[in-house]
Curated annotation (Swiss-Prot):
An annotated GO cellular component: multivesicular body
InterPro entries tied to this protein: C-type_lectin-like (IPR001304), C-type_lectin-like/link_sf (IPR016186), C-type_lectin_CS (IPR018378), Ca-dependent_lectin (IPR051077), Collectin_CTLD (IPR033990), CTDL_fold (IPR016187)
UniProt KW Disulfide bond keyword: yes
PROSITE patterns (UniProt xref): C_TYPE_LECTIN_1, C_TYPE_LECTIN_2
Protein name as catalogued: Pulmonary surfactant-associated protein A
Function as written in the Swiss-Prot or TrEMBL entry: In presence of calcium ions, it binds to surfactant phospholipids and contributes to lower the surface tension at the air-liquid interface in the alveoli of the mammalian lung and is essential for normal respiration. Enhances the expression of MYO18A/SP-R210 on alveolar macrophages.
Low complexity biased stretches: 69-82
């Protein structure tokens, strides 16, 4: 039995030697572990990792200190849009009465200058024959020829009326203006509801006339009156163009 065991061991050893020769490596059984080595040097820093999720908010900090001083005023801004107009206020109290006009030397001086200028203007117009004074009336013309309604409106805008003689003196003054312009002129008269009855434009009946012989004879168809260059009157329709003479 012992012999058999020795034989088997010998065969195993021979086989093991042949295996070493063939592979040039001999496989032995693991040895006893050695002692641990010393710590090596620290490795290099690794690359930055991926950005992580935000963390939760931290707790509220303590209150700050006292507020600082106010800053300086800024630059003035651009003006805004105008606002809506407010309601009209109540009238104020009535002031004390002023001084009478005759006590105001400056006003009196101004009025005196105005009167002087008016008199000068009247003198120039009188010399030109475009204005004549008779009593408290002034007769004037601008030389235009218009129909009756247009003359009436023209004189009203100037603050007067169509010339209407109420005396021989006034009729003569109007006649002299007509002669100067060598034309006829309308008078401030109009026929009433009854043919042949004429009135002043204020509705008063005519108290002075100087009709041409046989006039008026329009029989209600000629409502206006014209004056000839000899001062006599004739009834006429109101659409003709005649010299505009106003009285003031």
């Amino acid at each position: 039995m012992l012999l058999c065991s020795l034989t088997l061991m010998l065969l195993w050893m021979v086989a093991s030697g042949l295996e070493c020769d063939t592979k040039e490596v001999c496989l032995g059984s693991p040895g006893i572990p050695g002692t641990p080595g010393s710590h090596g040097l620290p490795g290099r820093d690794g690359r930055d990792g991926i950005k992580g999720d935000p963390g939760p908010p931290g707790p509220m900090g303590p209150p700050g200190g006292m507020p600082g001083l106010p800053g300086r005023d800024g630059m003035t801004g651009a003006p805004g849009l105008p606002g809506e107009r407010g309601e009209k206020g109540e009238p104020g109290e009535r002031g004390p009465p002023g001084f009478p006009a005759y006590l105001d030397e400056e006003l009196q001086g101004t009025l005196h200058e105005i009167r002087h200028q008016v008199l000068q203007s009247q003198g120039v117009l009188i010399l030109q024959g475009s204005m004549l004074e008779v009593g408290e009336k002034v007769f004037s013309t601008n030389g235009q020829s218009l129909n009756f309604d247009a003359i009436k409106e023209l004189c009203a805008r100037a603050g007067g009326h169509i010339a209407a003689p109420r005396s021989p003196e006034e009729n003569e003054a109007i006649t002299s203006i007509v002669k100067k312009h060598n034309t006829y002129a309308y008078l401030g008269l109009a026929e009433g509801p009854t043919a042949g009855d004429f009135y002043y434009l204020d509705g008063a009946p005519v108290n002075y006339t100087n009709w041409y012989p046989g006039e008026p004879r329009g029989r209600g168809k000629e409502k206006c009156v014209e004056i000839y260059t000899d001062g006599q009157w004739n009834d006429k329709n109101c659409l003709q163009y005649r010299l505009a003479i106003c009285e003031f």
